Amino acid sequence: MADVTISQGITSIKNDPNFKKNRMAPGRVVKNVVVHAILAVLALIWLFPIFWVVLTSLRAEKGSYTYYFWPKALTFDNYVKLFTDTSSINFPRMFLNTLFIAVCSCIITTIFVLFVSYCMSRLRFRLRKPFMNLAMILGLFPGFMSMVAVYFLLKAVGLTEGGLIRLALILCYSAASGTGFYIVKGFFDTVPKSLSEAAILDGCNGMQVFTKVVLPLSKPIVVYTILTAFLAPWLDFVFVRVIVGAKSEYWTVALGLYNMLEKEYIYNWYTSWAAAAVIVSIPIALLFIFVQRNYVDGMTGAVKG
């Protein structure tokens, strides 16, 4: 009797239209398995270099060439060396140089981009469309194409010597940042203009509308702008290489890591180079982890241009 009841129950479930609708077809199962297998392989490929760098940073043996993958001994001495051995490569100073340049560039770039984007979104003026088209065309070319011209301009005004080198790098990263307004403008376009009009009726001026109405509603794109503005100077190598050159007191971490792999340093500094790579990536990783949701939401602002 119990078997008959169970059989009837199974039959009724199979005849249920919702069961048939939700049941996954065999072909779809195979497709999902293949897709997830490919994604797993790609994830391993992408994660392997990170794992290798971390493992190398903990390796006790010196040198860059080894016949084994797993270190014979693990140690944190490579991290300690970065901050204690400053006789030939001064990593703490490189880190502070990079942090100073990145923070200053980030602040200036964020202000420029937000203001230009808001103007392009809300204001209507002559030559607005040609300016937008010109900015889009210029954005298609990589920044290093202007590297030589920028260097000679900076040299002509005396910004390639002494402490002014830091100012020169900040100008390189932030001076023309306002032309990269398209994504932020797209997000501002989604903010209802009726809110701005209501604020004006309540007595707000243009700046108050921007700071008290539009910006609080645009937190995702502000976070996106801050992150992208910080990453450019933090990771840049080309402009630093050209402008700073051999002046080691003004090196950033990108140029410092590059020089750690030079012939005279590579044997003693290779594992410390890996440790420095880990340290440099930590601030960026933490920023992305904490503001990932806002960053993704900000990227959707490009949908409506």
Regions found by a protein language model. Name each.
Residues M1-P26:
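Short, Lys/Arg-rich, polar N-terminal cytosolic tail immediately upstream
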Residues V4, G9-I13, K31-G305:
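A structural signal for multi-pass alpha-helical bundles of membrane permease subunits
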